[in-house]
């Protein structure tokens, strides 16, 4: 027997066909969220306050400093926040110190900074009672980038861009004449030498000394002549720069100096962030640039004079290892230049310079200039960075250095929750800083306290805006646990500061070789977002700079064996190494079986000898994301179908009684465990008590843990989230062990569907075009039954005419409609309701007409209640019937927080039990989707020789053209597993081979071709050919026919065109479009067409009259003019065209305006009759009133 047994949790054992030993556990799958948020609480917040503070007033008398902050206990628990539609957040308190420099007085105070949303243990936020996820963003990393292009003369031109995290861009470029130019913040270009002069290096000779002899530089200096001899070269340069940045303003050297300082050298306005400084230092340091170059000078130890590398040496890895410690020294090959006093910065500039030979003209010496040793704390650019990047730019023309690929994952980084929050918080704090400064100058300095200076409104508003309306703060996809998990691991290139759908080209969306082990090449949406929204690969982690790292096993340089030492590499580090594939055959001691192996180097797949190897992949599944790793036989599926398979697993509806797949990949347990939906034991211990609602575990230190299970909770997607215990009394549990299954889980594993018996055969054309033929057994035995919970709410508000009232006394409603309401008018739990039934009885006061003086007097005397009310009850919408599961009532008296003007709110939960039916969408894990076309009685389905009827019939035509052969392999292996009574695991790219599959088939005593004779259930005759029959995992998806079925007779109309609205949500009609009109014209159905275009659409008068005629039983009158035609006429008239409409006799037809005179819309006779009746009724009431009054008060006579 091939394969070996592996335990997944304590409740499931699978036969695994994996050949490769797992050397590394998968990381916690939601740590990208939790780690990032934890960093924000621990460091990010403090960093923010340190950046903004201290705040000084304009005169320099007061200064406000940050001391410390703390988060207090949250007001609500997670569950309470859900119930009360509140935020799960904690109050943030900041300790501030105000120093008065005039008196030396110091005041410290604790200031409340608003409520800060907290992350739940599941990696989500509760905002206004709804669970939200902050999606991580993929953005271009700050740093220095070099690019090349080919101009119209077929010459290669180079460009350089220094991109900060925030601040002005700096760009270098050359023109057709090879003159080098600089652009500051996308303005007009100036010669490069002008910028160097402005930094305080005025003469041509100084510039040549610094940057070295270069053709392009010489041409640039020739162009840059001294125009105004009254100014020094530096002053003239400063004025030139100012003129480009602020055209039209009077230019002086001083204003230019302060402007340049503010643009680039002021940490408050220009920020590279730690990642930008890291990238610039890495790109410009000589360590990376010397590799592969030929030295044009001898490098010696500055202390001993010992030669490290002689002239004409080519710097390879070994030479670099010897040089590296020296290159890290501050003074090794360091050159310091002192700028003139007129420059922007007075500080001297230190560079690291080494001479090498040009690649293009090998005898030409070139300076390699590094930016020296700049501290990681310096978050703005300094002159050394600018000079070193200019040098890199010039050296590119000599063939030294390399250009950058912007889609390389070494140049794209991830902004996770913590950083996104930090950026938002910074915006709020900087707005607050302005307010504080203004208040400092207004308030009395002797009595002012920190509390009086601080206005927290901008901070609170920016946080609220981020969680409520940012493109990256999303309503969590809660269809099933896999959907949740994937949503938390999603990477989006969209959002603020990112790309937009319309402008993103093909290159950005494409799979890049650096995605390997970092981002899944398969899981991405179909449609306009393809390639812009990705998923983190299963083993990938995000480092402190936001770059994605993936783990590799180190290969020993001496023995060339694979060690168990794991290194995490970013994409640009990986470019230096040769990496063997995970499935390279190994001996038990870690040595390679063969002398040559398949490996990767940059974007090449190469066959190489083992002495060239540096690393080896950790696992075959490190390439793909979690959802993709759940597809067995992925290697046998076409990638387009695998993409659909991965995406559709997220849409599987949690079933009432799910089963884990017989053919899994071993990923099901980990996905369920980390999704946050299973209940995990927080401490080890022994189970003392279990029921459906609570589990009690006695810890080893004798204290008791009580776990409450989630019962029938509505998820964000309206699915039923319910937990079931899987431990028994007396069981011992470990820390982090699953003690209760969540939705779509079974025995601690992900269970998105069922394992039905499936045959690939046609059946009376019912499975044409991917349709699915189902056996009635699946309906009867509730295999694909799911529970859906919908929430409806009704609010009683204060109106101008008085408060609304929730009551059972509803006008014009019979007792029959009120049978399920209690005495307050609220539906009882357990009642069965259907469309249109009342859930909450509510009446709203009607507008009263203006009363005459006499009537007002009568009102004042008798205080009688003639105020009318109208029925505004909450009713069950179309298709929303079911059983009332729960009713929640919120009132002010009970201490619930309600929005202003609301006196009472009632929330009703309706549960529907949906069996699978014709029209529902189903799918396997290989992108094999279809809709149910017929449900066949069990006895009519084809059956196997042992009499077992098949559950599902799929069309065999769906396999060859789609190239998802994985489903056929799964079918055979699934059948073998079912017959053997086992579960199997076949991990992606390392699963069951052909031989394993057929061995299992033989072991299960199945026919050697895996096929079976099938008999027709209706006639008992065998079908002609043998049919592939087996077990395949099949899911019911969230696209259910119940949610889509819709019909309308009358309903709402659009305001302008008066045509019916569209769509189920608006209760709209079906669009009868241009082509449908042609069809009826061609058929000659003139009357049908006429009524579709008039009565049934937008002939306002016609539809009212038609209704009257139908009610009275009269013939239907002729249609009038459609409203949309009137709109068209009005539009033409608005263009100044005098358009008239003529009839057949050339007489003008009057087009009335809707608002002028609506006589013909409403029946005038009926209206006058109604008015007369009302008047008579009123007179009668007044007479009765007068009579009653005289009866009570005889003296009135």
From Swiss-Prot:
GO cellular component: DNA-directed RNA polymerase complex
Bias-annotated ranges (Low complexity): 1186-1197
PANTHER family: DNA-DIRECTED RNA POLYMERASE I SUBUNIT 2 (PTHR20856)
Biased composition (Basic and acidic residues): 1172-1185
The protein's assembly and partners: The RNAP catalytic core consists of 2 alpha, 1 beta, 1 beta' and 1 omega subunit. When a sigma factor is associated with the core the holoenzyme is formed, which can initiate transcription.
Protein name in UniProt: DNA-directed RNA polymerase subunit beta
GO molecular function, one term: ribonucleoside binding
Transcription as UniProt keyword: yes
Pfam families, per database record: RNA_pol_Rpb2_1, RNA_pol_Rpb2_2, RNA_pol_Rpb2_3, RNA_pol_Rpb2_45, RNA_pol_Rpb2_6, RNA_pol_Rpb2_7
Region called Disordered, residue ranges: 1172-1197
Organism of derivation: Latilactobacillus sakei subsp. sakei (strain 23K) (Lactobacillus sakei subsp. sakei)
InterPro entries with a match to the protein in the record: DNA-dir_RNA_pol_bsu_ext_1_sf (IPR042107), DNA-dir_RNA_pol_bsu_external_1 (IPR019462), DNA-dir_RNA_pol_su2 (IPR015712), DNA-dir_RNAP_su2_dom (IPR007120), DNA-dir_RNAP_su2_hyb_sf (IPR037033), RNA_pol_bsu_bac (IPR010243), RNA_pol_bsu_CS (IPR007121), RNA_pol_bsu_protrusion (IPR007644)
Entry-linked NCBIfam families: PRK00405.1, rpoB
Enzyme class: transferase
Keywords: DNA-directed RNA polymerase, Nucleotidyltransferase, Transcription, Transferase
Keyword DNA-binding: no
Family: Belongs to the RNA polymerase beta chain family.
Catalytic activity field: RNA(n) + a ribonucleoside 5'-triphosphate = RNA(n+1) + diphosphate
Chain's role: DNA-dependent RNA polymerase catalyzes the transcription of DNA into RNA using the four ribonucleoside triphosphates as substrates.
Lineage: superkingdom: Bacteria
């Amino acid at each position: 027997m091939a394969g070996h047994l592996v335990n997944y949790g304590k409740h499931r054992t699978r036969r695994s066909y994996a050949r490769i030993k797992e050397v590394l556990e998968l990381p916690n799958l939601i740590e990208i969220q939790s780690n990032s948020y934890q960093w924000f609480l621990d460091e990010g917040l403090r960093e923010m306050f340190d950046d903004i503070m201290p705040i000084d007033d304009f005169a320099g008398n007061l200064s406000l400093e940050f001391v410390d902050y703390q988060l207090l206990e949250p007001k609500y628990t997670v569950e309470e926040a859900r119930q009360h539609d509140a935020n799960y957040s904690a109050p943030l308190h900041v300790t501030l110190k105000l120093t008065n420099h005039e008196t030396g007085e110091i005041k410290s105070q604790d200031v409340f900074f608003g409520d800060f949303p907290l992350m739940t243990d599941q990696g989500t936020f509760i905002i206004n009672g709804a669970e939200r996820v902050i999606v991580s963003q993929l953005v271009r990393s700050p740093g220095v980038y070099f690019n090349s292009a080919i101009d119209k003369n077929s010459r290669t031109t180079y460009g350089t861009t220094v991109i900060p995290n925030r601040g002005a861009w700096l760009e270098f470029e050359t023109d057709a004449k090879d003159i080098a130019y600089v652009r500051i913040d996308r303005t007009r270009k100036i010669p490069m030498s002008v910028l160097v002069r402005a930094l305080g290096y005025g003469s041509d000779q100084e510039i040549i000394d610094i940057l070295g002899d270069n053709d392009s530089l010489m041409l640039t200096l020739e162009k840059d002549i001294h125009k105004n001899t009254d100014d020094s070269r530096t002053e003239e340069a400063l004025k030139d720069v100012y003129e480009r940045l602020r055209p039209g303003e009077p230019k002086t050297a001083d204003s230019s100096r302060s402007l340049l300082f503010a643009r680039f050298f002021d940490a408050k306005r220009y920020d590279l962030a730690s990642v930008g400084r890291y990238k610039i230092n890495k790109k410009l340091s000589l360590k990376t640039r010397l590799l592969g170059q030929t030295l044009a000078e001898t490098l010696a130890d500055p202390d001993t004079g010992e030669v490290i590398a002689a002239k004409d040496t080519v710097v390879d890895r070994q030479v670099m290892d010897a040089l590296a410690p020296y290159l890290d020294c501050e003074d090794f090959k360091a050159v310091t230049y002192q700028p003139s006093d007129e420059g922007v910065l007075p500080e001297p500039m230190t560079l690291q310079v080494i001479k090498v030979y040009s690649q293009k003209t090998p005898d030409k010496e070139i300076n390699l200039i590094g930016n020296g040793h700049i501290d990681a704390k310096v978050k703005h650019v300094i002159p050394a960075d600018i000079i070193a990047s200019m040098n890199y730019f010039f050296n590119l023309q000599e063939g030294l250095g390399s250009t950058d690929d912007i889609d390389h994952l070494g140049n794209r980084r991830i902004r996770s929750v913590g950083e996104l929050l930090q950026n938002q918080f910074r915006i709020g704090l900087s707005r607050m800083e302005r307010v504080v400064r203004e208040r400092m100058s207004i308030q009395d300095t002797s009595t002012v306290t920190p509390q009086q200076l601080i206005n927290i409104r901008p901070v609170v508003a920016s946080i609220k805006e981020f969680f409520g309306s940012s493109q990256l703060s999303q309503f969590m996809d809660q269809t099933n646990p896999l959907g949740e998990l994937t949503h938390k691991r999603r990477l989006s290139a969209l959002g603020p500061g990112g790309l937009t759908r319309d402008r993103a080209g093909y290159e950005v969306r494409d799979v890049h070789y650096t995605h390997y082990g970092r981002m899944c090449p398969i899981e991405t949406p179909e449609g306009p977002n393809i390639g812009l929204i990705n998923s983190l690969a299963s083993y990938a982690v995000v480092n402190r700079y936001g770059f994605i790292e993936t783990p590799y096993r180190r290969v020993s340089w001496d023995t060339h064996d694979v060690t168990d030492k794991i290194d995490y590499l970013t994409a640009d580090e990986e470019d230096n190494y040769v990496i063997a594939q995970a499935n390279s055959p190994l001996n038990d001691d870690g040595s390679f079986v063969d002398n040559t192996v398949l490996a990767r180097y940059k974007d090449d797949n190469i066959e190489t000898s083992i002495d060239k190897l540096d690393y080896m992949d950790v696992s075959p599944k490190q390439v793909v994301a979690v959802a993709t790793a759940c597809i067995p036989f992925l290697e046998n599926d076409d990638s387009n179908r695998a993409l659909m398979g991965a995406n559709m697993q997220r849409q599987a509806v949690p079933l009432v009684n799910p089963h884990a797949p017989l053919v899994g990949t071993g990923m099901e347990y980990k996905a369920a465990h980390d999704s946050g939906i299973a209940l995990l034991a927080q401490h080890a211990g022994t189970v003392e008590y279990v029921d459906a609602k609570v589990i009690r575990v006695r810890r080893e230190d004798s204290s008791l843990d009580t776990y409450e299970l989630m019962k029938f909770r509505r998820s964000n997607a309206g699915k039923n989230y319910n937990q079931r215990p899987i431990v028994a009394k007396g069981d011992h549990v470990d820390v982090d062990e699953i003690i209760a299954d969540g939705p779509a889980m079974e025995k601690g594993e992900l269970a998105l569907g069922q394992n039905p018996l499936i045959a690939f055969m046609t059946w009376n054309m019912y499975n044409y075009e991917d349709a699915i033929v189902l056996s009635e057994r699946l309906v009867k035995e509730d295999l694909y039954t799911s529970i859906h919970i919908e929430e409806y709410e009704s609010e009683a508000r204060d109106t101008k005419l008085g408060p609304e009232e929730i009551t059972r006394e509803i006008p014009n409603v019979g007792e029959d409609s009120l049978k399920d309401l209690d005495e307050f008018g609220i539906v009882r739990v357990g009642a069965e309701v259907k469309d249109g039934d009342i859930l909450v009885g509510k009446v709203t006061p009607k507008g009263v007409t203006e009363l005459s003086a006499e009537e007002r007097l009568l009102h004042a005397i008798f205080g009688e209640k003639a105020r009318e009310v109208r029925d505004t009850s909450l009713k069950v919408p179309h298709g929303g019937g079911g059983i009332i599961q729960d009713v929640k009532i919120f009132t002010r008296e009970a201490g619930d927080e309600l929005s202003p003007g609301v006196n009472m709110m009632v929330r009703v939960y309706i549960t529907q039990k949906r069996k699978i039916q014709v029209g529902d969408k189903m799918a396997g894990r290989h992108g094999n989707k279809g809709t149910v076309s017929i449900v066949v009685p069990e006895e009519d389905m084809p059956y196997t020789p042992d009499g077992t009827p098949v559950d599902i019939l799929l069309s065999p035509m769906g396999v060859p053209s789609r190239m998802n052969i994985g489903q056929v392999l799964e079918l055979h292996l699934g059948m073998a597993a079912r017959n053997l009574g086992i579960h199997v695991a076949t991990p992606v790219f390392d699963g069951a081979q052909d031989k394993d599959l057929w061995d299992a088939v033989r072991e299960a005593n199945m026919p050697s071709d895996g096929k079976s004779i099938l008999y027709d259930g209706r006639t008992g005759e065998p079908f002609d050919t043998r049919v592939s029959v087996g077990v395949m995992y099949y899911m019911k998806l969230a696209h259910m026919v119940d949610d889509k079925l819709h019909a309308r007779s009358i309903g709402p109309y659009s305001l302008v065109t008066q045509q019916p609205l569209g769509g189920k949500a608006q209760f709209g009609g079906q669009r009868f479009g241009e082509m449908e009109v042609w069809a009826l014209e061609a058929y000659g159905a003139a009357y049908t067409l006429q009524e579709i275009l008039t009565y049934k659409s937008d002939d306002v008068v016609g539809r009212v009259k038609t209704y009257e005629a139908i009610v009275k039983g009269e013939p239907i009158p002729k249609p009038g003019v459609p409203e949309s035609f009137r709109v068209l006429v009005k539009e033409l008239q608005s263009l100044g065209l005098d358009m008239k409409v003529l009839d057949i006799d050339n007489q003008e037809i009057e087009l009335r305006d809707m608002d002028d005179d609506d006589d013909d819309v409403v029946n005038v006779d009926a209206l006058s009759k109604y008015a007369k009746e009302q008047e008579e009724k009123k007179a009668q009431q007044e007479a009765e009133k007068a009579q009653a009054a005289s009866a009570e008060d005889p003296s009135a006579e």
